[in-house]
Amino acid sequence: MVVLKPDKIGDADFANYFCTYGYLYHQKDMLEDQKRMTAYHDSVRLNPKQFKDKVVLDVGTGSGILAIWAAQCGARKVYAVEATYMAVHARKLVAANGLENVVEVSLFLFVYLYFRTSIWAIRLTDVVFLYP
């Protein structure tokens, strides 16, 4: 695993931002926010044509719920990227939904996707970006 070391100036901000999202209680709070989840659910589940046979990049996947919904809407492949160890829980949820062949959960920061040439070899018109 490659770990990104932040600049010295922003160490505290970087650590505080990412450590908060790494706890289950924080994910639970977001999942229980009915307005948030209804908006996300409707934007994905009510627009299956936007996801059918597409490649989806879910940056900051957290629990993986958006990645799961995208896969359920027919996405060909979903790259679910998470910078915290919440990725471990997201992988379990993806597997529990039987989607591990479609959803790939990765524990690393977005910058490292530049090295994953398989993503960028796909026409951009076939890529859907999920970034809440």
What are these model-derived regions, one by one?
Residues 91-112, 118:
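S-adenosyl-L-methionine
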Residues 35-54:
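Conserved alpha-helix/loop element of class I SAM-dependent methyltransferases that forms part
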Residues 85-89:
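Conserved short alpha-helix immediately C-terminal to the canonical SAM/SAH-binding motif I
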